[in-house]
Regions:
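Charged/polar low-complexity intrinsically disordered segments
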Residues: 6, 17-18, 27-28
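Compositionally biased regions
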Residues: 10, 22-25
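Compositionally biased low-complexity segments enriched in histidine and/or tyrosine
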Residues: 11-17
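Charge-dense, helix-prone N-terminal extensions
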Residues: 28-157
Length: 157
């Protein structure tokens, strides 16, 4: 999946040029991740802390179920949704409650990402434009950050 990070960074650069804004490259800091079963993992807490550090975003809890939205401050558009749900809702076998991240994604990436482990058609969102990612360590923290950055850029206007 090294190619994924390169493709996302290229897309972020293209969108930044369109909007005349600069996006700094992603910092790859291994100290900001938890480790589970020997794998680096970004969980809900680390994701929300990273979003606050990177964008100054405080999570919004519009429902009383613990699910939260990350919004742009200026236009209030969502760029990410973090929720707990039964893995069956993602089309998986099993009955576990899992943390899931929804992000807006570029059409060029979304189809190929859904063929990779940890990626799913977006739950409760437009499946053509949004993607669900399980926060269970299957998807690397760097890929998650890249996709949140892309989603942030795609929802800017």
């Amino acid at each position: 999946m090294v190619c994924l990070i390169e493709r996302v960074n290229l897309l972020i650069g293209a969108y930044a040029q369109k909007t005349d804004s600069a996006i700094s490259p992603i910092r790859k800091n291994p100290n900001d991740m938890t480790e589970r079963n020997g794998r680096r993992k970004m969980d809900r807490t680390e994701l929300l802390e990273w979003a606050k550090e990177t964008y100054g975003t405080e999570p919004d809890y519009p429902w009383n179920d613990g699910n939260c939205v990350l919004r742009h401050e200026n236009n209030h558009k969502w760029y990410a949704l973090v929720m707990k749900l039964n893995e069956k809702k993602l089309g998986r076998q099993g009955d576990r409650i899992v943390d899931v991240l929804n992000v807006k994604c570029d059409l060029l990436l979304i189809g190929s990402l859904r063929t990779q482990p940890g990626y799913f058609p977006a739950y409760h969102m437009n499946k053509d434009r949004w993607l669900s990612i399980m926060l269970d360590g299957t998807v690397s923290p760097d890929e998650i950050k890249d996709l949140v950055k892309l989603s942030h850029q795609l929802t800017k206007k």
